[in-house]
């Protein structure tokens, strides 16, 4: 997983010039970033090693039909152009949309039923990456069929439960931590990938973009004993790991949005300005035997 994250981080692109329709692939694994990675392989030891492991994993996935490693298959296809990966992604997507639901039995048994959770959010992300990668290898009818299936299984439950009226069952007061950003933002990325075929998907992605700043700005609720999402210094009350996951999901959506809307300005999020200081403060040992301040003093 660390290997795919290494390259995924490099593959985040900010383009220039506005486009009404998405030119696939154009979310995270953009042609520009793919080319940059190709140039670095052979020159950067870590990048070369990461790519080798990713391709090996993708080759193993050719033997199955699981969505779980669709990001590996997608990257392998975009890096190599080998149709065997595209064919496998197409097969996986067509098989995936045959499901009745992606919801878990545990969550669906709740009252009211939770149609979506973190597991479903991750499936939405993987589906978005796969659809974006293989889009140009699909016929018009296949694009439409897969888009409708992914919208039903992923976008509608995620944005329906967590964001959109009149079916929304969660709020920042009830679920203001990183579940909210994961479910909303991964649903948003999937919606972005489907927007050429489905106007409702484009509207859903726009709603995510419009409302996402409210998660950062949530001021808490004294009556329900809910702390605000971030304090003035940039810290998150639910711990470093919760902050990392929640912010990661939000930023991935913003990167995909920016790539899909080159030239557009992103919303101003003041809380982002303090996040690097927060992470550095929490991760930098300053007590006991691991006190880096003492070691720094000796070195200086």
Language-model segments: residues:
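Generic N-terminal leader/processing signal
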Residues: 1, 292-293
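Aromatic-lined, polymer-binding surfaces characteristic
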Residues: 26-41, 46-289, 295-296
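Bacterial Sec-dependent N-terminal signal peptides
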Residues: 1-21
């Amino acid at each position: 997983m660390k290997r795919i994250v290494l390259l995924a981080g490099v593959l985040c692109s900010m383009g220039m010039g506005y486009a009404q329709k998405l030119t696939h692939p154009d979310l995270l694994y953009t042609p520009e970033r793919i080319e940059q990675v190709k140039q670095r392989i052979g020159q950067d030891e870590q990048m070369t090693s990461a790519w080798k492991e990713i391709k090996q994993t993708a080759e193993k996935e050719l033997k199955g039909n699981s969505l779980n490693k669709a990001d590996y298959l997608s990257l392998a296809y975009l890096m190599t152009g080998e149709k065997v990966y595209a064919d496998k992604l197409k097969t996986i997507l067509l098989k995936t949309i045959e499901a009745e639901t992606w919801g878990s039995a545990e969550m669906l048994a709740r009252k009211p039923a939770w149609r979506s959770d973190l597991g479903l959010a991750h499936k939405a992300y993987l589906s978005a990456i796969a659809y974006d990668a293989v889009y140009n290898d699909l016929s018009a009818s296949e694009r439409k069929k897969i888009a409708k299936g992914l919208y039903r299984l992923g976008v509608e439950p995620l944005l329906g439960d967590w964001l959109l009226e009149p079916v929304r069952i969660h709020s920042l007061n009830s679920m203001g931590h990183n579940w909210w950003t994961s479910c909303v933002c991964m649903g948003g990325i999937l919606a972005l990938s489907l927007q050429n075929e489905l106007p409702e998907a484009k509207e859903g992605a726009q709603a995510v973009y419009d409302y996402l700043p409210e998660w950062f700005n949530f001021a808490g609720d004294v009556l329900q004993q809910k702390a605000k999402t971030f304090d003035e210094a940039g810290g998150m009350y639910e711990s470093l790991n919760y902050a990392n996951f929640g912010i990661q999901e939000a930023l991935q959506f913003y990167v995909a949005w920016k790539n899909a809307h080159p030239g557009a300005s992103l919303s101003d999020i003041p809380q982002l300005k303090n996040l690097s200081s927060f992470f550095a403060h929490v991760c930098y040992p300053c007590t006991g035997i691991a006190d880096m301040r003492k070691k720094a003093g000796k070195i200086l």
